[in-house]
Amino acid sequence: MKIELVTHKTGEQIPMMLDASGMPVVLPNEFILARRSLSTNTLVRNLRELSVLYRWLDKSNCDLSAKLLAQNSFNEAELKGGLVEALRVDQSNGRISAVAPNTFNQRLTTTRQFISWCMDVLISQLPLSSLDYERLRERKSFLLKTLDGSFMSATPMRKSLRKGLNEAEIDFLLEVLHPEAEQGFGRDSAVKLRNYVSVGLMLFCGLRPGELLSLRVEDIQFGAISAIKVERRPADPLDVRRPRPQIKRNGRVIPIENKQLVFTLNEYIVTWREVLESKSQDESDYLILSDEGCLCRNPQLHSFFSCCDRNMLIIFLTT
């Protein structure tokens, strides 16, 4: 089974499951279309979880719809001794081992939801006078009850206290990233200013990486009380980033209370962002651009923070 991400003309991205011959697998793809309001990453994960189910069905030479409708459908031994055990196995990287309890529970949850949806579809296709209505309702109840009894108790995870940066660490980070700092890093002034603005927006406005990379220039509002507008928009067909940055929280307006950040942000938009954009042939409305003037991607942002971590440690040890 293979998962392909299809980008439509509207910019919407919907994953699709393909079989070994490259043809779409009908039922899981229809199931995903019914859940298209969820994020693309969630839909991709759901299809990967269902691909485990379909590999087991292929290995058992079983057609799901026919089996669900048959007089002799799945019994408890087939479900618990076959399907559930297949969901426990991790076959990535050529190794066969058990997946973590949380991963198994996610697979089982998606499989349960999918089978419930399949049974609802099959029942809805019956004529009103059909004698199979009650039989299929009882079968659905049996299948779901059997799967419900297979969930694992997740092992308690070792929870370490997550520490945010204290005031001294924030001051040190901003001092290192300041565009005029001697020890700052960045290939030119435009990159240094972009780095400072990116970190400042995340520190003082609480933005997530996906929210930062989704910001457009028009979302920055300068005035007596400067603010940024975080807005969930329809998919942008011109956004070629894979995966696309996503805004998972509700839209909101966040005041920018740090005067230095407001001044630097204005300078970046008026002067230095155009310098970055001139390095690329493509124009963009997005606020944060890469060193080459293209749309900045999540891996590039993560790489920047890793670079920050290493450089800050070196500067701290040498000062």
Language-model segments: what does each one mean?
Residues E257-T319:
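Active-site/catalytic core of tyrosine-dependent DNA strand-transfer enzymes
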Residues L27-L43, L50-L147, E180-F185:
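N-terminal core-binding DNA-recognition domain of tyrosine recombinases/integrases
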Residues A168, E175-P209:
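Basic, Lys/Arg- and aromatic-enriched nucleic-acid-binding interface segment
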Residues H8-Q13, M23-A34, L50-Y54, T110-W117, ...:
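Short, structured motif recognition centered on aromatic/hydrophobic residues
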Residues L5-N29, L33-L47, S97-L108, D188-L193, ...:
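Short, low-complexity cationic-aromatic patches
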Residues V121-Q125, M202-A227:
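Short, charged phosphate-coordinating catalytic segments
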Residues F142-H178, D239-K259, S280-D282:
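DNA breakage-rejoining catalytic core of tyrosine-based enzymes
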Residues S214-T264:
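Conserved tyrosine-mediated DNA breakage-rejoining catalytic core shared by Y-recombinases
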